[in-house]
UniProtKB/Swiss-Prot annotation:
InterPro entries: Mgm101. This is Mitochondrial genome maintenance protein MGM101. It comes from Saccharomyces cerevisiae (strain ATCC 204508 / S288c) (Baker's yeast). The keyword Transit peptide applies. It is found in: Mitochondrion matrix, Mitochondrion nucleoid. Performs an essential function in the repair of oxidatively damaged mtDNA that is required for the maintenance of the mitochondrial genome. Binds to DNA. Keywords: DNA damage, DNA repair, DNA-binding, Mitochondrion, Mitochondrion nucleoid, Transit peptide. It comes from the Eukaryota.
Length: 269
């Protein structure tokens, strides 16, 4: 009798083990996540499994991704487009008449803005707001673009929407954005930002967005003088100077540009 109970216990234990074991199968649907899908016999839930390093290196579309990113993301883009099925835990519902700014070109070139708005947009820049890089490139800080847009359209009257996935290569983050003002698509531009290690990717995505905003503002005439060769030369003569400096650590000497009202800063002296 004891031996019979022992055999039944072993059979029951084996059955439980078989129910809990998992298998790995490849997805066949076009909408499936890249890589294998892990399925459980006692559950209908499926979870994506990231590709291994060897799998990630096989695809030609993954060659531009760094090996570290491949191991974590399976060679997929950093971000993907949200849909009505996965946005905000399925709380989003498509409303008739909604505009999908990811693909729509609604309002582009449809009508001009009011005269006051146009005046605020093309207002000449204050020389005090313009900065210059050590290599001589003049630019307007990104926050100044936002202030100009807020002044012209009002806070909440404009926005920047993604128009593509975020692409991460071994050294660069890039994504396409569209500028929406008062319900109209104004401009589309691709932002880009370099990064030096994978820890800097989140910061690079924000820099990519800022770069796209600056490029979109060119179509509104914001800071248009920054691309005018005559203005650039005059600004450098009136407000900037060149100085020979020495790098604190490498001891190398070079000539850099800086504003006349600024002092040489670290790492130069």
């Amino acid at each position: 009798m004891k031996s019979i109970f022992k055999v039944r216990g072993c059979v029951s234990h084996a059955a439980q083990f078989c129910q809990k074991r998992t298998v790995v199968s490849t997805g066949t649907s076009n909408t499936a996540t890249a890589g294998a899908v892990r399925k459980s016999f006692n559950s209908t839930e499926t979870k994506p499994v990231f590709a291994t390093k060897s799998e990630a290196g096989n695809g030609s579309h993954m060659k531009e991704y760094s090996s570290g990113i491949n191991s974590k993301l399976g060679g997929t883009p950093l971000e993907t487009r949200s849909t009505a099925d996965d946005s905000l835990n399925n709380s989003y519902k498509q409303v008739k008449g909604d505009i999908d700014w990811y693909t729509s070109w609604y309002g582009l070139g449809m009508k001009p803005f009011e005269a006051k708005v146009q005046k605020d947009l093309i207002e000449p820049l204050d020389p005090k707001d313009i900065e210059i890089k050590p290599d001589g490139l003049i630019y307007l800080p990104e926050i100044k673009y936002r202030r100009i847009l807020n002044k012209a359209f009002g806070a909440g009257g404009w926005g920047l929407v993604p128009r593509s996935q975020t692409i991460v290569t071994s050294k660069l983050v890039t994504r396409e954005y569209g500028l929406i003002c008062h319900g109209q698509l104004i401009s589309v531009a691709r932002g880009e930002q370099d990064y030096f290690n994978e820890a800097g990717i989140p910061t690079a995505t924000e820099g990519c967005k800022s770069n796209a905003l600056m490029r979109c503002c060119k179509d509104l005439g914001v800071g248009s003088e920054l691309w005018d060769p005559v203005f650039i030369k005059k600004f450098k003569v009136d407000h900037c100077t060149e100085k020979f400096v020495e790098h604190v650590t490498t001891k190398r000497k070079k000539k850099i540009w800086l504003r006349k009202d600024r002092q040489v800063e670290y790492p130069y002296k």
